[in-house]
Amino acid sequence: MISDSLLDSLATAISKKTQLPEFPAGISVADAYPCLPILTQKVSGSSAGIKAGITNVDLQKLFGLEEALIGLLYQNGEIRSGSNLPYSPHRRIECEMAVTFDAHGNPIAVGPAVEFVSLDFARPEDMSPGNVTLCNLGADQFICGDMRNWDSFDFDALSALEIVATRDGEIVLTTSPMDSLGGPKSAHAWCMAKANELGYSLPQGGILLAGTNGSALPGEPGEYKIHFGHLGSIQFTIEGA
């Protein structure tokens, strides 16, 4: 069902940030999952960790899914706060929480993150759960903020925290860090269990991006600052089209 040539074409498109190839019909999520380590190896040589996707229950129903999905992060995908990114009409911005973990999946630290997701399908009919999964859920680049020790972290305080995203000083999103999978603690437990179920190897010092809080934002040009309350902020600029 999923040929080596398709994976090669996908890896090339993802690496070069060009349009994805056409997909054969009928690829399921179950078909896609075993191919993700192979694709990730082709794109970046190794995985930087795991990402959660389609964590919104309404979206899951829309796609006919019974649970969220996971993908793998590319080793070359992490960038620094303050980075400049070229404009891409296919980029979406996701406000997330990140968890670092050891090779056994045990949590090390937790903090804010922003993920940049990109899916440029050649045909509308190619946008299916299986094909999205096969593309590592659109994994591209991400920024992690200041990370805090997991064991001493006050998870109860997250319930009162607001994530506020601004573009050129105007608020474009207000959301909660508990919105995706009930927060980073439960997200970590679910994602590690899913990765183990799928037989994925976990990198030492790996990163979990725990899913989109609120709506994904269109990657319009501008200066962005994502405020995570007492956890700090992440900023970046998307250059003009």
Annotate each predicted stretch with a short phrase.
Residues 193-202:
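Short, solvent-exposed cationic patches
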Residues 211-212, 228, 238-240:
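Active-site proximal loops enriched in glycine and acidic residues that flank catalytic Cys/His/Asp
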Residues 187-193, 206-208:
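Short, structured beta-strand/loop micro-motifs enriched in basic residues and often containing a Trp
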Residues 167-169, 210, 229:
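Short strand-turn-strand beta-turns centered on an Asx-Gly dipeptide
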